[in-house]
């Protein structure tokens, strides 16, 4: 079973983050059941809104999301980083253009189906 652990931020941000991550797992990686995703909602000092890093194997991931983002941008950023999770989990090349292309589509689908 996939595990998602979220720390930092406010309770409503953690709840939103969990919901978006579980939604994107269903959309992007429906067959995987052994993902371990650790998310930290934190202040990111540069112009980036989020980061995704692979852990010890291609099933363990660390994501940082800027907690200062508004909800719309937070959902977009989470969707973007989850595309990178998909790329790493499937041993695909991490292509930024794919993440940028899929993030608005995933975010819109999330808002329409989950809210």
Predicted regions and their residues:
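Zn2+-dependent metallopeptidase catalytic core
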Residues: 12-35
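Catalytic zinc-binding patch centered on the HExxH motif and its immediate surroundings
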Residues: 40-62, 71
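Active-site recognition of the HExxH zinc-binding catalytic motif
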Residues: 76-88
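Membrane-embedded glycan transfer/ligation machinery
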Residues: 72, 76, 100
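Soluble non-cytosolic domains of exported or imported proteins
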Residues: 15, 72-73, 93
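Post-HExxH zinc-binding segment in Zn-dependent metallohydrolases
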Residues: 90-115
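Hydrophobic or amphipathic, alpha-helical segments that drive membrane association/targeting
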Residues: 1-12, 37-47
């Amino acid at each position: 079973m996939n595990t998602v652990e979220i720390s930092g931020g406010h309770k409503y941000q953690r709840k939103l983050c969990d919901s978006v991550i579980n939604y994107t797992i269903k959309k992007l990686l429906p067959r995987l059941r052994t993902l371990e995703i650790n998310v930290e909602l934190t202040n990111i000092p540069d112009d980036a809104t989020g980061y995704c890093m692979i852990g010890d194997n291609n099933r363990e991931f660390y994501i940082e999301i800027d907690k200062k983002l508004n909800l719309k941008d937070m959902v977009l950023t989470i969707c973007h980083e989850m595309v990178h999770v998909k790329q790493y989990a499937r041993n695909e090349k991490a292509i930024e253009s794919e993440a940028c292309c899929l993030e608005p589509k995933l975010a819109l689908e999330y808002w329409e189906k989950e809210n």
